[in-house]
Amino acid sequence: MYKLVLNHFLQEKNLNEVYVTPKILSEIDAIDCTSYLKMPMVKKAIIEVFSKNSFLEKMKLHREHKLYITGIKSQVGLCVQMGHKAGFYFDLYKLAYLADHGLINKAIIILPSKNLEKFCNTSSIASYELISKQMLLFKKTKNYKMHLMCLDIKRRT
């Protein structure tokens, strides 16, 4: 049996600012995973945890367009990205739009680890390891505070 772990690399103060509580972390840790796991299953489970903890699901960017981010709580945007790199970069544009319109000032972006990518037997996704390196190029282009978080999988002990 395996479990999901959200690695955040943030101090407790910063976690509180983006509403990632110890309860959310323990609920993610409690998700049981078998040897068969696909990225859509992982994404659904993570969204469910955040939704149960007061994040509103599917934040629509504009009433005339069918564009969404995963969720929002107060002025913190949430994107759970378990897909291709292009989807991640499109999420950045959507978050920037929300920030430009005063709807968010911070964002959490959850990305799978290379380890989780391998476990799910997939490839060419926006892994935390890849994206965190690439984002060093864009430090000064964001109009909101972004926190990348790494979703990993470990054997349950």
Residue ranges and their predicted role:
Residues 57, 105, 146:
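Hydrophobic anchor at the start of a short beta-strand
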Residues 114-157:
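Domain-level recognition of nuclease-like catalytic cores that cleave nucleotide substrates
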Residues 77-90, 114-116, 120:
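Short beta-strand-loop-alpha-helix junction that forms the active-site gateway
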Residues 1-63:
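Acidic-basic catalytic patches of nuclease active cores, encompassing PD-(D/E)XK
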Residues 98-104, 137-142:
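Arginine/glycine-rich "motif VI" loop of SF2 helicases in the C-terminal RecA-like domain
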Residues 103-113:
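Conserved beta-strand signature within the Rossmann-like core of class I S-adenosyl-L-methionine
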Residues 35-74, 84-93, 97-100, 155-156:
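Active-site metal-binding core of divalent-cation-utilizing nuclease and nuclease-like domains
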